[in-house]
């Protein structure tokens, strides 16, 4: 199994929008990364993302570029300060490649 870790794109300020969706710059940056991954012929069928808007949008952009039929899955335990134990337990049972779109510091804990 290959595991791809992706931090969400730049989000708008909480002051501007409490849901913190991707900013226009964030959308553009993620689209560039998605096109790079497509040209690299990355094959991933499942994309886990946190329930937060910026991670969901990042996962959608990447999935649509590299695997339009891919499976997007929101996981409650991928938010910034969540413990990694549930993710580690799930990863230990997987055989298929997976992309996780989440946040710091959560992603740093997986290294």
Describe the role of every protein-language-model region.
Residues 1-2, 97:
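A general, composition-driven signal for non-globular sequence regions
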Residues 2-82, 107:
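Active-site-proximal alpha-helix that buttresses catalytic centers in soluble enzyme cores
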């Amino acid at each position: 199994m290959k595991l791809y870790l992706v931090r969400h794109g730049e989000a708008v300020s909480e002051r501007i929008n409490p849901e913190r969706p991707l900013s226009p710059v964030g959308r553009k940056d993620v689209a560039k990364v998605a096109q790079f991954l497509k040209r690299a012929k990355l094959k991933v069928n499942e994309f886990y993302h946190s329930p937060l808007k910026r991670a969901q949008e990042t996962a959608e952009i990447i999935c649509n570029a590299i695997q339009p039929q891919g499976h997007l899955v929101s996981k409650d335990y991928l938010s910034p300060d969540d413990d990694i134990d549930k993710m580690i337990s799930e990863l230990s049972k997987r055989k298929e490649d997976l992309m996780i779109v989440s946040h710091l510091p959560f992603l740093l804990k997986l290294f």
